Regions:
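Classical protein tyrosine phosphatase
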Residues: 97-110
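WD40 beta-propeller repeat blades
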Residues: 127-302, 306-325
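Acidic and/or Ser/Thr-rich intrinsically disordered tails and linkers
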Residues: 1-71, 217, 306, 325-482, ...
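Structural motif
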Residues: 57-62, 109, 242-247, 288-295, ...
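Acidic/polar low-complexity surface segments
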Residues: 113, 117, 158-160
Length: 520
C-alpha cells in the first residue's frame, strides 16, 4: 500500500477534517460508559440519537440535528428499556422511526414526533422478542422497507418485519451462528450478510436461509469488525503480534485476504466507515483522537492512504450523517459525530474537499447516491427478490428516481392512522405477549424485567397523538383513555407512598428491637 499521497493522483488527496466549535456542538450530553464496542450514536437529516448513561434502565437522547450549545440536564429521553441500551439505528426510509437494542433481550421500534421529543417516551410502537440473551447489534436492511436484522449473545441472528400488525412481533427468519457475533454488515442490495465472530473468522451468509457461503481460514489477521465496501469486504482487527490491522477481502473467496496492513499498536477497536460514492474508507479507533482515510480500489494495491485527522480528544463512539444530509454547497463529502465522553460533548466533524468555487454544486463530488425511498417491501425481499437502492441526486431540487415498476401500497403499510393509533392505545392495558412462540422456549427474563412484561411506568404523554384531530367519537374515547391513565398514575403514586411507609415502619421496628436487646 502506498503511504505517500503524492503517489496516487486522487481528487480527494487534500480532504481535511473541520471540527465544529463548542458553540455548534452538543454540550452536556451524559454519554454512556458501556464497554460494548458499538457506535452509540445514529444520525439522520432531522435528529441525532445518543445512548446516555442512566440508572434504573436504559435510555437515549433524541435531539434536533440543528441543536446548538448545551443540552439541558432534564432533557426528555426515550427510556422504555429496563436495562442498558447497547445500540440505536435510524430507519433509512423513515426519519421519524428509530430502533434500539438492549441488555433486556429486546429490540424496540420507536416513533419520534416530528417536532422532537417534548415528553419522556416510555412506550415503544413495537417490541421485538425472540432473543434469550442481550442484543448487541442491529442493522436496517439497505433496500427493503421495515426490515431489521438483530444479533445477540445467544448465537442467533434474527430478521424482523416491523410492518406486521401487533405491538409484539416474532422474527420472520432465525439464523444460528457457530460463534458469538462481533460485527455484521449487509451488502449494498441486502443479498448477503457478512459477519465477524468471536473466533476471529469472517463468514458470508445468505440471510434468508442462514447458509454459510464463505468462511475465512486461520490467518494472522484476527478480525473484530467487518464492513461491505462495494464488491469487497473490509475488516479491522489485530495481528498475531497485537498490532492493529486493516484487511481487504474478496467476498467470494475468503481463503486469503487481498491485502493486510498493520497500522499501530493501540488497543482500541477500529471502526470502518465506507462511502460508496467517493470510494473513501475511514478508520476511526475507539479511544483514539485520530481518523485515517483512504481511497479503496478494486485493483492492487487496493488501498491508497490519503491523510489523517488528528485531535487531542479521544472518541468513544461515532455517528455518521447520511449523504442526503450533507452540506453540498460547502463541498462536504462526509460528516462524523464524535462522542467525547471526557467533555460530555458530541462534536460534528466535517470532511471537506477544498475547491476554489464555494457555494456551487460540484457534480464530480456528488454522483447519484442512495435515497430515502425503499426499493421493495419486506415481503418482496422475503420471497427472494433482490434490488439495489433507489438513487437520488444531491443537487438541490432533484428527486429520487425509481427504475422499478410502481406497486400499490399494501394495507397496513406506512405509518399508523388515527384509528390504528386509538385501537393500540385502548388495547394497551390488556396487551399480553403471545404464548405460542415456539422459538422462544429458551428465553428467560432477567432480574431487571417487570413481571409479566407489563409496563407500570406508562404515562398519558408517552406517545404523541397524531396532528390531525380524530372524529368526535374517537376524541371522546381518547379523552376517556387519558383520564383512566391519570387515575392509574395517581393510584400508582399512592401505592409507592404506601410501600415507602411500610419500609420505614419495618426499619423503625427493627431499630426498636435492637435497642431492647441492647438494654437487656
Amino acid at each position: 500500500m502506498s503511504w505517500c499521497s503524492s503517489c496516487h493522483g486522487s481528487k480527494f488527496r487534500h480532504v481535511f477534517g473541520k471540527a465544529a466549535g463548542r458553540d455548534h456542538a452538543y454540550d452536556g450530553v451524559p454519554i454512556t460508559r458501556s464497554v460494548h464496542d458499538n457506535h452509540y450514536c445514529s444520525v439522520n437529516p432531522l435528529f441525532i440519537a445518543v445512548v446516555t448513561e442512566c440508572a434504573g434502565g436504559g435510555a437515549f437522547l433524541v435531539l434536533p440535528v440543528h441543536h446548538k450549545g448545551r443540552v439541558p440536564p432534564l432533557q426528555p429521553r426515550v427510556s422504555g428499556h429496563t436495562s442498558r441500551v447497547l445500540d440505536v439505528k435510524w430507519n433509512p426510509f423513515d426519519d421519524l422511526c428509530i430502533a434500539s437494542c438492549s441488555e433486556d433481550c429486546t429490540v424496540k421500534i420507536w416513533d419520534i414526533p416530528s417536532q422532537g421529543v417534548q415528553q419522556n417516551i416510555t412506550v415503544a410502537r413495537k417490541t421485538l422478542i425472540g432473543h434469550s440473551k442481550r442484543v448487541g447489534l442491529i442493522e436496517w436492511h439497505p433496500t427493503a422497507r421495515d426490515l431489521l436484522v438483530s444479533s445477540a449473545y445467544d448465537y442467533k441472528v434474527m430478521v424482523w418485519d416491523v410492518s406486521q400488525d401487533g405491538r409484539v412481533l416474532r422474527p420472520v427468519r432465525q439464523l444460528q451462528t457457530p460463534e458469538l457475533l462481533l460485527s455484521v454488515s449487509l451488502s449494498r442490495d441486502g443479498r448477503w450478510l457478512a459477519c465477524c465472530c468471536r473466533d476471529r473468522r469472517l463468514r458470508v451468509l445468505e440471510p434468508r436461509s442462514g447458509r454459510i457461503l464463505q468462511e475465512s481460514g486461520r490467518t494472522s489477521h484476527r478480525a473484530s469488525k467487518v464492513l461491505y465496501a462495494g464488491d469487497q469486504l473490509v475488516s479491522t482487527g489485530t495481528s498475531c503480534w497485537n498490532q492493529r490491522q486493516v484487511a481487504v477481502w474478496d467476498p467470494e473467496d475468503l481463503s486469503e485476504p487481498l491485502l493486510e496492513e498493520e497500522l499501530d499498536g493501540s488497543s482500541g477497536v477500529l471502526f470502518p466507515f465506507y462511502d460508496p460514492d467517493t470510494h473513501m474508507l475511514y478508520l476511526a479507533g475507539k479511544g483514539d483522537g485520530n481518523i485515517r482515510y483512504y481511497e479503496l480500489s478494486s485493483e492492487k494495491p487496493y488501498l491508497h492512504y490519503l491523510t489523517e485527522y488528528r485531535s487531542l480528544l479521544p472518541q468513544r463512539g461515532l455517528g455518521v450523517m447520511p449523504k442526503r444530509g450533507l452540506d453540498v454547497r460547502g463541498c462536504e463529502v462526509f460528516r462524523f459525530y464524535r462522542l467525547i465522553i471526557e467533555k460530555h460533548l458530541v462534536e460534528p466533524l466535517s470532511m471537506i474537499v477544498p475547491r476554489k468555487q464555494v457555494g456551487v454544486f460540484q457534480e464530480d463530488l456528488y454522483p447519484m447516491t442512495a435515497g430515502d425511498q425503499a426499493a421493495m417491501t419486506a415481503q418482496e425481499w422475503l420471497s427472494g427478490n433482490n434490488r439495489g437502492p433507489l438513487l437520488m441526486s444531491l443537487k438541490p431540487g432533484a428527486r429520487v428516481t425509481n427504475p422499478y415498476p410502481e406497486r400499490a401500497p399494501e394495507r397496513g403499510q406506512g405509518r399508523p392512522l388515527e384509528q390504528a393509533f386509538l385501537q393500540e392505545q385502548l388495547a394497551y392495558q390488556d396487551a399480553k405477549y403471545p404464548q405460542d412462540l415456539s422459538d422462544l422456549s429458551g428465553w428467560q427474563p432477567d432480574e431487571t424485567q417487570a413481571p409479566g412484561w407489563a409496563y407500570p411506568q406508562c404515562t398519558p404523554h408517552c406517545c404523541e397523538p397524531s396532528e390531525q384531530a380524530p372524529p368526535p367519537a374517537e376524541r371522546e374515547l381518547l379523552q376517556d383513555f387519558y383520564r383512566q391513565q391519570d387515575e392509574i398514575r395517581e393510584l400508582q403514586e399512592q401505592l409507592n407512598q404506601k410501600q415507602v411507609r411500610i419500609t420505614q415502619l419495618e426499619l423503625e421496628g427493627k431499630n426498636n428491637r435492637n435497642k431492647m436487646r441492647a438494654t437487656f
